[in-house]
């Protein structure tokens, strides 16, 4: 198992390109199953979860064509099996996203209950209830979700999400694209990745409106046609590199991104003392060598502060001037990184869903272990500013969400290297 060794103390300085968003790419890849012709998806990030999704298509009999820029062409007409097997699905929660498209397009699906990060309960019941509202008959047995469309196909439905669910919204929206009649999704997720998926569906000929609000309307169509679509930039990767620059007192320009999808994070970075300038597709952060000020953060569904940036801001507060409270309202069990940061000398108290972080001037390098994707990013950020060497184990978590993290940080002047386990 690979590890990262980071020698702290280098101030980050330079420019990097932001990758395509994993959380947009995965539902968009799943949505290609709805099409009755070849579809090309561009700006895919080089990540394990993306490779797994493409491998899953291969297992189903679809032969994706990938070019050197990691654009992929998918022709779902060659599909031979409607089963998403456990050995692939177990490593990736997003595999549940093929359920809606397969039932809508092919009338049935068998998808293993998913794996992925161990954060909270993240139930799949909203996906199941949404499809049942459209007439699907669903059984969960032997670790598999087995779904069948009614005779004549799925029917449009009004569905209310009793908790906001990004993947739930995406799954039901995809299924509704080919259902008969109108579907209205209420209390829908408003995330930019949901909007990106809706834009992709519309590029194939779907009729989706209201994405980005809490009510999405989908008028089902008979077929979806070929399209080329470029995945949006990754707002969490963008935010992670900006926090890394802030923590080290540095200056970083991130390119091929979108400042409008990151406003809550940029606001908190300004509050921490960062000077931020934005263009249409770039953001520059400059700390002018200053130590950040501690900030209070409360996670909530978009457009509020994203839960996927919570761990990074705990790392920022750990070396900031003052004390900041970080309140997690989305997932339980999402402070696992705190105990690893304690090993580096951080002063953090966890009380229920709140972490109280009192900044200290210097953290100390230590052997630490990544516990999930975003927690691992917080360990990398803390290691960049710690005295001495930090060894981060289990970095396969990082590789699930950050493309070429050590190369990008090296371009900014970080002393970081990957060593085989």
From Swiss-Prot:
Class in the EC hierarchy, top level: transferase
Reaction catalysed by this enzyme: phosphoenolpyruvate + UDP-N-acetyl-alpha-D-glucosamine = UDP-N-acetyl-3-O-(1-carboxyvinyl)-alpha-D-glucosamine + phosphate
A GO BP annotation: cell wall organization
EC number: 2.5.1.7
One family name in Pfam for this protein: EPSP_synthase
SUPFAM superfamilies in UniProt: EPT/RTPC-like
Record carries keyword Magnesium: no
Residues bound to UDP-N-acetyl-alpha-D-glucosamine: 93, 122-126, 308, 330
First-listed, main subcellular location of the protein, grouped into a coarse class: cytoplasm
InterPro entries: Enolpyruvate_Tfrase_dom, Enolpyruvate_Tfrase_sf, MurA_subfamily, RNA3'P_cycl/enolpyr_Trfase_a/b, UDP_GlcNAc_COvinyl_MurA
Entry keyword set: Cell cycle, Cell division, Cell shape, Cell wall biogenesis/degradation, Cytoplasm, Peptidoglycan synthesis, Pyruvate, Transferase
Signal peptide start and end residues: none
Chain positions found as 2-(S-cysteinyl)pyruvic acid O-phosphothioketal: 117
CDD domains xref list: UdpNAET
Molecular functions (GO terms): UDP-N-acetylglucosamine 1-carboxyvinyltransferase activity
Active site (record annotation): 117
Any one of the GO CC terms: cytoplasm
Pathway(s): Cell wall biogenesis; peptidoglycan biosynthesis
Binding positions (phosphoenolpyruvate): 22-23
NCBIfam families: murA, PRK09369.1
Family: Belongs to the EPSP synthase family. MurA subfamily.
Biological role: Cell wall formation. Adds enolpyruvyl to UDP-N-acetylglucosamine.
Listed name of the protein: UDP-N-acetylglucosamine 1-carboxyvinyltransferase
Species whose genome carries this gene: Pseudomonas fluorescens (strain Pf0-1)
Gene name, Swiss-Prot/TrEMBL: murA
């Amino acid at each position: 198992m690979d590890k990262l060794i980071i020698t702290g103390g280098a101030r980050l300085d330079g420019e990097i390109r932001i990758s395509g968003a994993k959380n947009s790419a995965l539902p968009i890849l799943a949505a290609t199953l709805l099409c009755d012709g070849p579809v090309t998806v561009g700006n895919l990030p080089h990540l394990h979860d993306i490779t797994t999704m493409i491998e899953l298509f291969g297992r189903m009999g679809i032969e994706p064509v990938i070019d050197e820029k990691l654009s992929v062409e998918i022709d779902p007409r060659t599909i031979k099996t409607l089963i998403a097997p456990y050995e692939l699905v177990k490593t990736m929660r997003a595999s549940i996203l093929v359920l809606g498209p397969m039932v809508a397009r092919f009338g049935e699906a068998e998808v293993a209950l998913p794996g992925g990060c161990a954060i909270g309960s993240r139930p799949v019941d909203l996906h199941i209830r949404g499809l049942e509202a459209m007439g699907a008959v669903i059984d969960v047995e032997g670790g598999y979700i087995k779904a069948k469309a009614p005779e004549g196909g799925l029917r449009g439905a009004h569905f209310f999400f009793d908790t906001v669910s990004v993947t739930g919204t995406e799954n039901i929206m995809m299924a509704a694209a080919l259902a008969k009649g109108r579907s209205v999704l209420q209390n829908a997720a408003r995330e930019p990745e949901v909007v990106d998926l809706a834009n992709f569906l519309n590029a194939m000929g779907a009729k989706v409106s209201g994405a980005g609000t809490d009510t999405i309307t989908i008028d089902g169509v008979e077929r979806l046609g070929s399209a080329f679509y470029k995945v949006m930039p990754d707002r969490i990767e963008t935010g992670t590199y900006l926090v890394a620059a802030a923590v080290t007192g540095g200056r970083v320009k991130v390119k091929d991104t979108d400042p409008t999808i990151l406003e809550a994070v940029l606001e908190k970075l300004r509050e921490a003392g960062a000077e931020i300038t934005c263009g249409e597709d770039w953001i520059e952060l400059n700390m002018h060598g200053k130590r950040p000020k501690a900030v209070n953060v409360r996670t909530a569904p978009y457009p509020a502060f994203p839960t996927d940036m919570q761990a990074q801001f705990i790392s920022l507060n750990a070396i900031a001037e003052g004390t900041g409270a970080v309140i997690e309202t989305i997932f339980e069990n999402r402070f696992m990184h705190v105990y690893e940061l304690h090993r580096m000398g951080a002063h953090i108290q966890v009380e229920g869903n709140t972490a109280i972080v009192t900044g200290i001037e210097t953290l100390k390098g230590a052997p630490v272990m990544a516990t999930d994707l975003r927690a691992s990013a917080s360990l990398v950020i803390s290691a960049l500013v710690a005295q001495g060497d930090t060894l981060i184990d289990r970095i396969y978590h990082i590789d699930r969400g950050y493309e070429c993290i050590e190369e990008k940080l090296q371009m900014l002047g970080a002393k970081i290297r990957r060593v085989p386990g």
